[in-house]
Amino acid sequence: MESMYSREQYLSLCKELEKDDYCYYVLHNAVISDYDYDMKMQKLLAIEAQHPEWKVLWSPSMRLGDRVSGNFPVVAHSHPMLSIANAYTLEELNDFFSRVEKTLGYAPIYTLELKIDGIAVAIRYEQGILVQALSRGNGQKGEDITANIRTIRSLPLRLPKDAPEFLEVRGEVFFKRETFEQINAAQRQAEKPEFANPRNAAGGTLKLLSAKEAAQRNLELSVYGSLSDENTESHYDNLMLCKRWGFPIFGQPRQCQTIAEVVKSLDEIEGLRDQLPMEIDGVVIKVDDVEAQKALGMTAKHYRWALAYKYAPERAETILENILIQVGRTGVLTPVAKLSPVFLSGSRVSRASLYNEEEIERKDIRIGDTVYVEKGGEIIPKVVGVCLEKRPEGTQPWVMPEFCPVCHGKVTRESDKVSVRCTNPLCSAGAIEKIRFFVGRGALDIDHLGEKVITKLFDLGVIHRCCDIFKITEEDLLQVPGFKDKSVKNVLKSIEKAKQAPLDRFIAALGIPYVGVRVASALAQHFLNLEAVMGASLEELKSIEGIGDKVAESIEAYFNQQDTIEEIQKMLSLGVNVLPYHRESSSCLGKTFVITGTLKKMTRSEAEASIRNCGGKVGSSVSKSTDYLVVGEDPGSKFKKAQELEIPILNENDLLKILYPN
């Protein structure tokens, strides 16, 4: 069929819609009605359906979303995405200024930006076209989330002609307060779990398998930096360039000539905090001069030229309606405050942490009290105090129950006199929590097995222990309300995938007391296979760096239990293959480094930790077994000895290239 439109008309329509999007989502100035915009978009979609070969990567239709693949490939960042150190007091802030001035020899200009509580991303453009977007991930590698990032209406899909040929921008993806409330209202309507806060909602949206669904949620982006060959010597000027190229930046960045100006601006911004459309938890302070940033360098974890000044947590007043008891995966009873709902830091709070019985007693918290609630780190609500003037008459001090609220078995008090534990191995609460942990994020990461599904399967008698996960059948899942053929297939596929379990994740999933992801990784790197971990002696466990006596004793006791051995053997018989740990190829692997002198871009302890993380060893003295000597300023006698032994000498930059080759 002959087309009613030419390719030139199609491209012109793309440009019109591109301009309409920019005016509405970046300048917040609608230039056409919603109806006219929709008519243009329908026209564009019709042309692209008739001429798919005309479709360009920057077409506004790309924002409408499509289904993405079931996994998000992991890609190395062009430059590490490090975190920013936090400061909570003026004293910590002044320490930062002093360190900067001491290193540079002068007081620099600073740029201030809003610290938006969102998800950090890196977005890459080539020849002016958006080609890839990555999550922050571990700072070295991130997940490819390009399809969902394209749905952000304020983000340009193509850049003006004066933009660099290759450009990477970094920014924060977030939700406005109003949008977040709408999303949670939709979750309640659909009888789905609400998001705890806007940051969690943004993270969950970026991981949606349907970009079309992501597009409906109206994500926002605020750019905070760029990487290109055309960057100027001023960070502030680079931000203004980004703005000129069409990138959104929420809250005008401020340039401060003096420390006094910085402190004044921090106070002014805090006063405007409640008026902002999104959540911020502080202000990021950056040395403005790019060359000065390079001179200040970085540590293994964060940049030395930037600091996040965090405001005091927001506080709300509400009524403590009840104190509930949660039973964790290890049987520990934890008191939780049930509150009259109150809005705090961008989310509705109805429960809060009370930590333990000792903390409740220390603060004299009673049911019926008017309490003060804060968000620790702006995430986890906690009860921080009581308004005694409003205490009702007749309230009684709260005491921990003597029996488990779930199985009614007697509880025992741990030797630390703080932890209270249900020791009944058949307690359903502990069993369900243990299974939830086993399949959750950071463990085996089995998709589609949430709390409600696990509880239902437990109640049906399908699962009682973690190993039962690998016996689940199609018939079992069809008993769960709401599960259809497609859902069943997704769960079974995830379970099958989880059978190929990396050693460190498998150890972490077991839920051994005091063993998290870091300790599990250390065990995997040391022992390399599951059999060796299970047979490790107490002395061998204690010899591993970062594992103390208490953790070592917990690991040994866990693997000496007959129930543990039988459950792991059952998993193996059901097809679970615990993959041996393979150290990544690295020029550090197995090499011994010795450090002498003062390093500028990281502390000695940070350098040593980075070497060990890459599979290297750190020696205290130079010998024939030393592979490299790292030399900083004012090296000692080790430098001379290394020269005599003809040991390779590295400066700090050489070391950084080995540690971070990408």
From Swiss-Prot:
Catalytic residue positions: K115 (n6-amp-lysine intermediate)
Domain of life per record: Bacteria
Entry GO MF terms: DNA binding; DNA ligase (NAD+) activity; metal ion binding
Residue ranges occupied by any BRCT domain in the UniProt entry: 583-662
Record bears the keyword Oxidoreductase: no
UniProt xrefs under Gene3D superfamilies: 5' to 3' exonuclease, C-terminal subdomain (1.10.150.20), 6.20.10.30, BRCT domain (3.40.50.10190), DNA ligase/mRNA capping enzyme (3.30.470.30), Helix hairpin bin (1.10.287.610), Nucleic acid-binding proteins (2.40.50.140)
A GO biological process held by the record: DNA replication
Sequence positions that bind Zn(2+): C404, C407, C422, C427
Swiss-Prot/TrEMBL catalytic activity: NAD(+) + (deoxyribonucleotide)n-3'-hydroxyl + 5'-phospho-(deoxyribonucleotide)m = (deoxyribonucleotide)n+m + AMP + beta-nicotinamide D-nucleotide
Cofactor: Mg(2+); Mn(2+)
InterPro entries reported in the protein's UniProt record: BRCT_dom (IPR001357), BRCT_dom_sf (IPR036420), DisA/LigA_HHH (IPR041663), DNA_ligase (IPR001679), DNA_ligase_AS (IPR018239), DNA_ligase_CS (IPR033136), DNAligase_adenylation (IPR013839), DNAligase_N (IPR013840)
Binding site for NAD(+): D34, Y35, D36, Y37, D38, S83, I84, E113, R136, E172, K286, K310
HAMAP family: DNA_ligase_A (MF_01588)
Family from the record: Belongs to the NAD-dependent DNA ligase family. LigA subfamily.
Protein name, UniProt field: DNA ligase
Source species of the chain: Chlamydia caviae (strain ATCC VR-813 / DSM 19441 / 03DC25 / GPIC) (Chlamydophila caviae)
